[in-house]
Amino acid sequence: MAKETPIQNTFDGGELSPLLGGRTDLAKYFNGCSVLENFLPAVQGPLVRRGGTQFINAKKTAEQGWLVRFQVSERVAYMLEFGDQYIRFYTDRGLLVDGGSPVEVATPYTTADLTAEDGTCAIRVVQSADVMYIFHGRFQTRKLQRLSATSFSLDLAEFTEGPFDDVNTDESVTVTTDAETGPVNLTASADIFLPEHVGTLFYLETADLSAVRPWGVYQTMSVGQRRRVDNRVYQCTTVGPTNSEGAPVTGNQTPIHTEGKAWDGDGRPITGDQRGSIGVEWEFLHAGYGIVKITAVTDGQHATGTVVKRLPSELQPGGGGSTTVTDFPISSMAPGSSSSRIEVSAPGHPFLDGNPIVITGTILFDSDGMGSNTNRNGSYIVRDRGANSYEIDASWPGPSYVYSPSSNGKATRTITVTYPSNAPTWKWAFSLFSDDTGWPEHGAFWRERLVLVRGRKVAMSVTGDFENFANKSAGGEVEADSGIVVTLNARQVNRAVWVVESDDLVIGTDGDEWLVGPIQSNQAVGPANIRADRRTAYGSRSIQPVEIGSKILFIQASGRRLRDYEYSYDTNNYVSVDTTKLASHMLRTGAVDMAYQQEPDSIVWVARADGQLVGCTYDQETGRSDVYAWHPHPMINGAVEAVETMPAPDGSADDLWMIVRREIDGQTVRYVELLRPPLGDNEDQAEAFYVDCGLTYRGDPAATISGLGHLEGQEVDILTDGAAHPRRTVSGGQVSLQIEASIVHVGLPTSCAAATMSLEAGAANGTAQGKLKRLTNVIARLYRSLGGNLGPTRDNTETLNFRRPSRPMGSPPPLFSGDTEPIPWRGGYERSARIWYTNDQPLPVTLLALLSVVSTNDDR
């Protein structure tokens, strides 16, 4: 009979699939376990018992909810509890209160809204400092703002100038308007408007600007006329004075402004050039398009709205028009150049020859006192214009009449410019997101842009202006920093389910994975420098991935695989590894939530659809480390429904938060709980926290522990000053102790268990599998541990003894480091030998190695 002394000194293979029970050819067979419960495989190799869960607070309502991290900085972070139309806040491992009341904001999301059809969270968020955008496919995007340490607000995110869907291409479906600014009526030639469009933006662009003549140098110009430069349309608001050489003309400085007014010359004449003053003032009107916010829909062809970006008058059926009224005072009147003319003195007046004017307020009186006062009020045409006077067609009443100093005479010019009739425009577009098409489901900050994603559409804001989605500049040009809309075009109509910002924007859909980035990598991302490439076809579940170093880890579409995703320079493409390949049973019921805990160990935590919490210790460094060890964490009377991480208050580690469903005192409750870290090397034994849904009493020695109403009627484990205490049942929110204690941890019992794979050792001829073998001298190598059992099966174990005769019976044995004494092995000869370690006391365990002597009979 051959004899061997094997050692399993690393457990970083985690719990392996039962399908690997015969794969002794795999290296991880010797690092893995057939059973691994409530242990954390450390990247260094040992198994460390997980800490217990600390009760933080009962969820506001008993319905399902979700957790979201709001991290302002490394030391300022909040955990958000999303529930039935509310958000609650946690910080410093407790509920955030202000004035004795929980800090809370109201939301539109009901319990049903918060959970997607596949059981995952329907909410996505993206954060920048004190602002968090909240996305839900059925609700307009919200903006959560941190106003102070205890004050938050939730408002609609009002995106400006877009984003818009594709511009209509059916020239038979047109839209007209009846105003350029303010309230406006929209009339369509077909049924295009829906009640769901109310509150969204509507884009209109002129199909034809030929009615507006191009601006040119030295064009005769009058107030009210319009000209265009490219697609920019301007209106003349002021001209220079008319002189004897001609009327005012445009200058030689092409208008380029896109707001307000500017002159194209200095407005002064040049003697001898046969022109009037050179240069007029231009007001910028529009760049060939405008935007309306729809306020009401009458029917499919009629809607009303408010203009938020001036509309071109060319969108109006009659072409629109403008009216300019100019008043100018009259200083005096006198006989004119003929008996049928009167000269009107008005220094600096703006009127031109031929202008119609209306004169009011004049008084002519007879200086001899013989005649009655009269006037020359009425409508006239300006004649023989001069810089300081002009004439009108009227006769002077007599040689003794003069213009009265008490007159309030003035002349009023009214110029109405009517533009040619226009064809209705077919260039219109609805908002990309609305109650009709749905709202953004995902977001990201990438390349100084806010990215909104829904379905196959990806919209990007103006660079550096996160809420502005204008796809053109104010002058109508598409520029490098303009807003962008990209469509993920593929054979299948797959829906985006996650977005991760990296060098490229990585988008996972339910059928494939995409990269969105610049065509020319040495140039800025812009409308003319953007690409969307389909790279792989794994497909994903709607769970936000986690990032570990340069890798992205996502749940595959079935919910039963966790894949890592990383760019490979060898293949010039992204490559993926199925981390559940060796533990395919671990996500068998499907994942519903996921979080990453970077410190103290690199662990991906997953909440399964059946309420099981599982983890994957992940440490991948090419040529150095190849750890992806899965480990389940069953709970007594507990189903984990949501997980999230945030930095611990002291920043030394990441805390895993969870919402746990439990049955307490005959009622279904949901608690917010926090996974406590294992006992640290610098912590006293009394600080060991290995109970679930637990609380800690710390104070003067006490024999009764109260404040346990959240565990009413439950049998609980107790650790008193580092010693395991007999279990008690909570009654009236309290338990009684056998002896007084100063540090007491009370909570639901937990247990841990680890079982090796079928041992492959001791055979002199070939494999040991299937051969009779016997184990003796089984030893556990432990570090700062206490309690536990060893045996051939879970239910057939021998208790390890750590109490020494020199230790007083009234005090707990100290934590043990070293090799346990060999125990009587309860197993006999067997063909599939395993070593089990179990511990059902609330005590710390770090299992470094399992050692044994294996005698194998080679006769089979």
Question: Model regions: which residues?
Answer:
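Short, surface-exposed beta-strand/strand-loop-strand elements in extracellular ectodomains
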Residues: 86-90, 515, 519, 787-804
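Elongated alpha-helical scaffolds
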Residues: 78, 82, 107-143, 507-508
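Short linear interaction motifs
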Residues: 47-50, 61-63, 101-127, 178-185, ...
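Glycine/proline-rich low-complexity spacer/linker segments in large multi-domain proteins
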Residues: 750-788, 792-800, 849-850, 856-860
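Beta-sandwich interaction modules
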Residues: 108-126, 438-439, 736-738, 806-842, ...
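Beta-sheet-dominated scaffold domains
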Residues: 120-125, 443, 449, 457, ...
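Small/polar beta-strand repeat architecture
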Residues: 4-21, 27, 101-123, 159-179, ...
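N-terminal beta-propeller domains
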Residues: 1-102, 143, 147-183, 306, ...
